[in-house]
Swiss-Prot record:
This is Small ribosomal subunit protein bS21. The gene is rpsU. Keywords: Ribonucleoprotein, Ribosomal protein. One of its GO terms (cellular component) is ribonucleoprotein complex. Belongs to the bacterial ribosomal protein bS21 family.
Length: 62
Protein backbone atom coordinates (compact mmCIF):
# COMPACT_ATOMS: atom_id res chain seq x y z
CA UNK A 1 0.00 0.00 0.00
CA UNK A 2 1.37 3.39 -0.99
CA UNK A 3 1.41 6.01 1.69
CA UNK A 4 2.15 9.74 1.54
CA UNK A 5 2.65 11.94 4.57
CA UNK A 6 1.50 15.52 4.00
CA UNK A 7 3.92 18.10 5.37
CA UNK A 8 2.68 21.27 7.07
CA UNK A 9 3.74 23.62 4.27
CA UNK A 10 2.57 21.29 1.47
CA UNK A 11 -0.74 21.73 -0.33
CA UNK A 12 -3.12 18.90 -1.16
CA UNK A 13 -2.53 18.93 -4.93
CA UNK A 14 1.20 18.41 -4.42
CA UNK A 15 0.61 15.50 -2.04
CA UNK A 16 -1.90 13.95 -4.44
CA UNK A 17 0.64 14.21 -7.25
CA UNK A 18 3.25 12.44 -5.10
CA UNK A 19 0.72 9.72 -4.21
CA UNK A 20 -0.18 9.11 -7.86
CA UNK A 21 3.50 8.94 -8.75
CA UNK A 22 4.13 6.36 -6.01
CA UNK A 23 1.16 4.26 -7.17
CA UNK A 24 2.36 4.37 -10.76
CA UNK A 25 5.88 3.39 -9.75
CA UNK A 26 4.56 0.50 -7.65
CA UNK A 27 2.40 -0.68 -10.57
CA UNK A 28 -0.84 -0.67 -8.59
CA UNK A 29 -3.07 0.79 -11.32
CA UNK A 30 -1.73 -1.41 -14.10
CA UNK A 31 -2.14 -4.45 -11.85
CA UNK A 32 -5.72 -3.43 -11.09
CA UNK A 33 -6.53 -3.08 -14.79
CA UNK A 34 -4.88 -6.42 -15.53
CA UNK A 35 -6.95 -8.27 -12.91
CA UNK A 36 -10.26 -6.55 -13.61
CA UNK A 37 -11.47 -9.53 -15.70
CA UNK A 38 -10.34 -13.13 -15.86
CA UNK A 39 -7.99 -13.86 -18.73
CA UNK A 40 -7.69 -17.40 -20.03
CA UNK A 41 -4.16 -18.79 -20.29
CA UNK A 42 -4.46 -19.00 -24.09
CA UNK A 43 -5.49 -15.33 -24.24
CA UNK A 44 -2.57 -14.40 -21.99
CA UNK A 45 -0.12 -16.22 -24.27
CA UNK A 46 -1.64 -14.54 -27.33
CA UNK A 47 -1.40 -11.08 -25.72
CA UNK A 48 2.23 -11.63 -24.70
CA UNK A 49 3.14 -12.93 -28.16
CA UNK A 50 1.56 -9.89 -29.82
CA UNK A 51 3.42 -7.58 -27.44
CA UNK A 52 6.71 -9.31 -28.27
CA UNK A 53 6.03 -8.95 -31.99
CA UNK A 54 5.29 -5.22 -31.59
CA UNK A 55 8.44 -4.74 -29.52
CA UNK A 56 10.51 -6.62 -32.09
CA UNK A 57 9.13 -4.47 -34.92
CA UNK A 58 9.95 -1.29 -33.00
CA UNK A 59 13.54 -2.35 -32.39
CA UNK A 60 14.08 -3.30 -36.04
CA UNK A 61 12.65 -0.08 -37.48
CA UNK A 62 13.84 2.37 -34.86
Amino acid sequence: MSEVIIHEDENFERALKRFKKKCEKAGILSDLRKHRHYEKPSERRKRKMNAAVRKNRRTRHG
